[in-house]
Amino acid sequence: MEQTKTIFLLTFLTVIFVFFGYSFGGTNGMLIAFLIACGMNFYAYYYSDQQVLKHYNAIPLDDTKHPVYRITQKLTQKANLPMPKVYLIPDHTPNAFATGRNHEYAAVAVTIGLYEMLNEEELEGVIAHELSHIKHYDILIGTIAAVFAGAIAMIANMMQFSGMIGNNRQNSNPIVMIIMAILLPIAASIIQMTVSRSREYMADEGAARLTGNPAGLQSALGKLENYARSGHQINNATEQTAHMFIINPFSGLKSTLGALFRTHPTTADRIARLEELKSELRK
């Protein structure tokens, strides 16, 4: 199922690029766009995780005695997973994400703010949540979706510019390109929403079962949501990568359109589902 989603995303990216190439440069533009899309697909599959980590200035954590490393190692062994690479993000806004392409090539990144704010039980809940994403192969889809959304934003900007000068180009259709420039960002949001919402519920449940302590994750989610709603955002946060985090970095921004295309379930709903899981785990 996850492989099918990956193929769909990469294929859709290729189609978008080819369409843009044809609209802008006819047959020659289409061929050039196809080659560019193939290169981007290769890059997205093998290197998109490193691009995201680099974007957030993530630093490899090799200190085996550090609480984040120690907890990750303990939970990884319990989940019967290979040890992922562990990164610290030098930012005091509490948040975390997982990235990579499979169990063998995976990484967990947490901000310094997360480590400073949460107690050990809460930290276990967050890290278990990210390991659940790794276990269920959500990480490849999420990371590719981030690169894909960024590419769509770039294409939309190019189309807006092309639409302005399109009357001077024989093969361009400025009206079509302007329409696409409007629709493409919406398509990116829908893809991010589809990728993320249901997977967050599954990762929450997986974390609760792995730790045996839903309360730890509940408490962590509440703290992270309250902090996000205070208006603080992680440095370099982008809408294209927002779906990767355990809490959307932009959840503090009030927007009707933003609520419609929300990448995460509401934190209240997530906490309520974890509450329901408590009684099941007590049995």
From Swiss-Prot:
EC number: 3.4.24.-
Keywords noted in UniProt: Cell inner membrane, Cell membrane, Hydrolase, Membrane, Metal-binding, Metalloprotease, Protease, Transmembrane, Transmembrane helix, Zinc
GO molecular function list: metalloendopeptidase activity; zinc ion binding
Keyword DNA repair: no
GO cellular component, one term: plasma membrane
Cofactor note: Binds 1 zinc ion per subunit.
Leading EC class: hydrolase
Binding site for Zn(2+): 129, 133, 200
Compartment(s) of residence: Cell inner membrane
Topology relative to the membrane: Multi-pass membrane protein
Catalytic center residues: 130
One GO BP annotation of this record: proteolysis
Cofactor: Zn(2+)
Transmembrane segments: 6-26, 27-47, 139-159, 175-195
A Pfam family of this chain: Peptidase_M48
Domain of life: Bacteria
Matching NCBIfam families: PRK03001.1
Stated family: Belongs to the peptidase M48B family.
Name by which UniProt lists this protein: Protease HtpX homolog
Organism expressing this protein natively: Aliarcobacter butzleri (strain RM4018) (Arcobacter butzleri)
